[in-house]
């Protein structure tokens, strides 16, 4: 995920905490899509636009985007509940554009003047809702008017932009109402008991210094109306179980494992046996990492598992093909002028398809029907047979790409920009994974290296796309193995990050496996945190560079954990 953003679990935890600021009011459980709310939004939008049309300058576009939902957040550790909060939230984003599509208040550095946000009354009181929308609309008009003045001044005194595309694309209005049946929301007490049992699994592993089990449920209705005639109502539901376990090496390095279960139906919750097996594997991994030696800087052959390759492509390629990164004086524009040129080996293709809900039996986080600007989601062929073909576009045009392809996404309260949905890498020359490993060992021998590195799992990363910074990336592996040329058993190492520049590293892919793996996560960038998925087969790189990871010097706990709970749980686990 982009720049300073941390691993996906941490990002999601912060987002969940934000949704849990205030307790649920008993007055208003979430119901079916709300016709009264939608009618109030439409009425106030058109009333406001009619009044503001008398102003100079007048808006040429306005929209209301309302999210009406409820969430349940439970955080548990060692069999106890740390947090349990059920929250109802109803919030509005008011967007407004002054000027004309060719040049408006959102131009360049004033991009985020196009939105004002606030909370709406949770009760269906049309007068109260209309009054809040009126207030937000007036605040947004004042902000947009000032920004438009700034834009005109700056445009008049500075050199012409290299890309003089319009600031807003013309799109056909969309009308849609989700008819999906409402998903039953979990009962809070039952979930708390489930969280207790899940988190108690770690009590039998004294080597785990800290563990958390995070249960999250959210269902929402999303309403979008615009002066262009768009009227969309969609329903969403998501359920997640996230498990985190941490320990600390003797030298102070923090070691972490994170596993996630995601589903759209609460009936698909993992069983206690599944969670217990996951906890056991995580504890085993942490014990092995604790004993593992520190890795050294390395440059040579590398093999990425499918899951690791998926995260790698999200960071290294995905962010750089987002539409807004192709224009603006501050953007590095790595691939802007490489359309119809080769950027990957000819056996690789990349698509982004948010219309896919399931891939290979795994539910995808990046599924949606319409983006946050009201454009229908669509499959985008980004790279075909190694050749760059397209970018991920919202309604901000770039040179030679004048229309949205349904990728304008944002967290509530922020302006949408082009973002990834479900990024999928496919190979036309896949070989069985066993053969891929053999070819990896051959490459190690060919280069005269004593070993290569196998990256089994990656927790996240960041990429730099601003022009005033190196066009580089840093990916954060968790489980990394030395694979020896002489046939010795693989050896786990720790404290290593993958680093490099995209144009170089993407040209070093030599082969892929035949099994696709999926990574689901939360991606952070300038338009906030959005759910995404990435999928890819295992990949062999002829050359990859790694560096040592920075870590602290805090000592591990001096005292062992209390013996009673651990001993009792070990006895129960042995039954």
PLM segments and residue spans:
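Short loop/turn microsegments at loop-to-beta-strand junctions
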Residues: 376-378, 478-479
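Bacterial N-terminal signal peptides
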Residues: 10-21
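Short linear motifs in exposed loops
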Residues: 235, 392, 492-494
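N-terminal secretory signal peptides that target proteins for export/translocation
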Residues: 1-7
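Active-site bordering "gate/hinge" segments
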Residues: 25-370, 375, 384-387, 400, ...
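C-terminal, non-catalytic macromolecule-binding modules
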Residues: 389-443
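Hydrophobic alpha-helical bundle architecture
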Residues: 366, 426-504, 520-527
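Residue-level structural signal for beta-strand termini and adjacent loop
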Residues: 257-260, 394-396, 494-496
């Amino acid at each position: 995920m982009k720049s300073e953003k941390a691993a996906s679990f941490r990002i999601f935890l912060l987002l969940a905490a934000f949704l849990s600021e205030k307790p649920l009011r008993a007055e208003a459980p979430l119901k079916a899509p709300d016709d009264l709310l939608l009618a109030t939004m439409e009425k106030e939008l058109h009333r406001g636009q009619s009044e503001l049309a008398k102003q100079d300058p007048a808006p040429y576009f306005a929209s209301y985007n309302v999210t009406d939902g409820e969430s349940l957040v439970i955080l548990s550790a060692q069999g106890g509940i740390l947090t349990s909060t059920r929250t109802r939230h109803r919030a509005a984003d008011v967007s407004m554009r002054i000027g004309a599509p060719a040049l408006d208040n959102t131009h360049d550095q004033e991009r985020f003047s196009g939105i004002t946000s606030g909370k709406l009354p949770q009760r269906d009181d049309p007068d109260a809702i209309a009054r809040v929308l009126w207030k937000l609309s007036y605040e947004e008009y004042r902000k947009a008017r000032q920004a438009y003045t700034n834009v005109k001044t700056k445009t008049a005194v500075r050199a012409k932009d290299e890309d003089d595309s319009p600031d807003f694309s013309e799109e056909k209005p969309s009308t849609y109402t989700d008819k999906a049946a409402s998903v039953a929301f979990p009962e809070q007490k039952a979930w708390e008991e489930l969280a207790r049992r899940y988190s108690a699994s770690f009590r039998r592993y004294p080597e785990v210094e800290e563990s958390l089990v995070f249960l999250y449920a959210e269902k929402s209705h999303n309403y979008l109306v615009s002066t262009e005639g768009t009227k969309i109502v969609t329903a969403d539901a998501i359920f997640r179980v996230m498990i985190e376990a941490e320990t600390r090496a003797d030298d102070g390095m923090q070691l972490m494992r994170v596993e996630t279960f995601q589903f759209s139906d609460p009936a698909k919750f993992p069983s206690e046996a599944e969670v217990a097996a996951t906890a056991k594997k995580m504890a085993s991994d942490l014990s092995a990492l604790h004993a593992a030696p520190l890795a050294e800087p390395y440059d040579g052959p590398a093999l990425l598992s499918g899951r690791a390759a998926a995260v790698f492509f999200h960071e290294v390629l995905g962010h750089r093909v987002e539409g807004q990164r192709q224009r603006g004086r501050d953007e590095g524009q790595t691939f802007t002028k490489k359309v119809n040129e080769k950027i990957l080996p000819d056996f690789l293709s990349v698509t982004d398809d948010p219309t896919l809900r399931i891939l290979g039996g795994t539910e995808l986080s990046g599924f949606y029907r319409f983006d946050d600007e009201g454009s229908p989601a669509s499959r985008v062929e980004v790279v075909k047979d190694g050749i760059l073909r397209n970018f991920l576009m919202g309604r901000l045009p770039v040179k030679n790409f004048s229309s949205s392809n349904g990728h304008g996404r944002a967290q509530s309260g922020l302006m949408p920009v082009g973002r990834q949905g479900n990024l999928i890498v496919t190979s036309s020359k896949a070989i069985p994974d066993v053969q891929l490993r053999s070819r990896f060992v051959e490459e190690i021998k060919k280069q005269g290296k004593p070993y290569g590195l196998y990256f089994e799992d990656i927790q996240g990363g960041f990429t730099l796309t601003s022009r005033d910074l190196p066009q580089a990336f840093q990916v954060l592996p968790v489980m990394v193995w030395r694979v020896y040329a002489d046939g010795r058993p693989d050896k786990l190492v720790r404290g290593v990050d993958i680093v490099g520049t995209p144009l170089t590293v993407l040209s070093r892919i030599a082969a892929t496996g035949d099994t696709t793996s999926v990574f689901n996560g939360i991606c952070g960038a300038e338009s906030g945190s959005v759910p995404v998925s990435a999928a890819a087969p295992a990949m062999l790189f002829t050359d990859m560079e790694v560096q040592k990871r920075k870590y602290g010097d805090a000592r591990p706990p001096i005292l062992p954990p209390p013996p009673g709970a651990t001993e009792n749980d070990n006895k129960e686990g042995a039954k």
